[in-house]
Amino acid sequence: MLTKNINFKNFKLKKKKLNLKKKFLSIINDENQVINSLTNYYRNSYSKKFVKKYKKTSNFRVIGMGGSTLGTQTIYNFLKDKIRKNFIFIDNLQTQKNKNENKNFTNLIISKSGNTIETVANAHIYIKKKDKNIFLTENKNNELYYLAKKLKSEIIHHNNFIGGRYSVLSEVGMLPAELMGLNASKFRQLNSLIKNKNFVNALLLNVSSTIDLIKKKKI
């Protein structure tokens, strides 16, 4: 065949990819606080000393909704074989009480706004007198902040610029991960990933394909 040794290039697709790459690099190089939370430059609002206080604690209960708990649940389920701690997740009002409920727990109550109705309700349902409690919420007047003050509990600041769905590599996901005995810096790998050309090219190709499908109303 005459075309056997001819390589065809889709210049339209190449131009799209180039424009997308420029936008990607612009976002990466910009001082974006959410992007920063994916890197090892991010500074947690809790200390290693704080984590060590709970080193001998075996039972944890995570109370929250949606993005406040899903990331932590994913980490726990994926790495369960390496984790020697017991974590229970309360993420709706229908959650059945576990057979271990007679044990003492350290509760992690998570809500950015501090006013999520289900989280506030479950906090009142599950917190017992002998439990230790850690609240992750914004440092402002809200229902969980008031409850934490009333119980004289630990309060970890939830940065207001990170929404629930983007929060897994912030305090919301990394504090529970460190309480599991995992290392937060092992998760924040954006610094090294953006230096990997294969990763960046695959990412851009996937994003470009997704955008095209959305424009064509196929997804």
Protein language model regions, located:
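Extended, charge-enriched "interface" segments that sit outside catalytic cores
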Residues: 1-46, 51
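Low-complexity, compositionally biased segments
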Residues: 10-13, 94-95, 209, 215
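Short, functional N-terminal and low-complexity linear motifs
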Residues: 18-23, 141-144, 155-156, 202-205
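Generic structural motif recognizing short loop/turn segments at the entrances and edges of beta-strands
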Residues: 2-4, 31-34, 84-86, 151-152, ...
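Glycine-rich phosphate-binding loops that contact phosphosugars or nucleotide phosphates
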Residues: 55-197
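Acidic catalytic cores of enzymes that act on phosphate-bearing nucleotides/polynucleotides
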Residues: 40-41, 50, 182-188, 196-219
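Glycine-rich phosphate/diphosphate-binding loops that line cofactor/substrate pockets in enzymes
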Residues: 47-58, 99-104, 207-217
